[in-house]
Amino acid sequence: MAMTLSTKAFAQRGVSARKNTVRVYAATTKVNPKLASKTEVERFKQATGLPAPAINGKQFPLKLGFTKTNELFVGRLAMVGFSASLIGEILTGKGALAQFGYETGLNGIEVDGLVIGLIAFNLIAAVLPTSQTFVPEEQDTISERPAGPLQDPRITLLEPKKFFGVQGFGFTKENELFVGRAAQLGFAFSLIGEAVTGKGALAQFDIETGLSLRDTEFGLVVFILFLLFAAINEGSGKFVDEESA
């Protein structure tokens, strides 16, 4: 009888110990996500010697990869760069490549490799909107996204919102992705046109339309201001890698 009681007591102690282990493991699991985000900030500081970039007091360590957040950043750079090149062409009469050569003292032949790489990167980033799925964190959201022309060939320009992946006018991040992709394509093709013709984006536009810069000045100013505002406006909405922030 004493043996039986001691056996039961030992078994109860074992069960209690296992429960405590499970509780400790569960508590550790719940704490891990907070530690992970802190570790990312610390790793960024350790690798670069600089604090992680902060927006509204919240730190965002830079991550390499074709994510929507990075694509948004590249799109903003394209909008700012395209706008600046147009302003420079108005002031100097030279296109983006000629301005680059003037600033650096290099001629077009010496920067051919750089220009080709820049054009290729702009084209790839603009025409491969699904490339952000290379990041594992965004794989789970693919099924929740509405189909686009790459997934459903029945979607045509007759349905512009579905075709371009926008939901209407407004400074949302989804719409800004579209504007950024358009800026990347426009910048890339303007560089290709300048390499072929020797003329900047505005001069190419004049050749295509037969209109002088004086005739298109107002529309051009509105276009440049829109690109600049779209590039610096934070907009609304968030991406999958911001949901845990």
Swiss-Prot record:
The chain crosses the membrane at residues 72-92, 108-128, 185-205, 217-237. Signal peptide: none annotated. It is found in: Plastid, Chloroplast thylakoid membrane. It is a multi-pass membrane protein. The keyword Plastid applies. SUPFAM superfamilies: Chlorophyll a-b binding protein. Keywords: Chloroplast, Membrane, Photosynthesis, Photosystem II, Plastid, Thylakoid, Transit peptide, Transmembrane, Transmembrane helix. Induction: Induced transiently by high light stress (at protein level). Residues 1-25 form a transit peptide. GO terms for cellular component: chloroplast thylakoid membrane; photosystem II. GO terms for biological process: nonphotochemical quenching; photosynthesis. Belongs to the ELIP/psbS family. Required for non-photochemical quenching (NPQ), a mechanism that converts and dissipates the harmful excess absorbed light energy into heat and protect the photosynthetic apparatus from photo-oxidative damage. Seems involved in the activation of NPQ, possibly by promoting conformational changes required for activation of LHCSR3-dependent quenching in the antenna of photosystem II (PSII). This is Photosystem II protein PSBS2. It comes from Chlamydomonas reinhardtii. The gene is PSBS2.
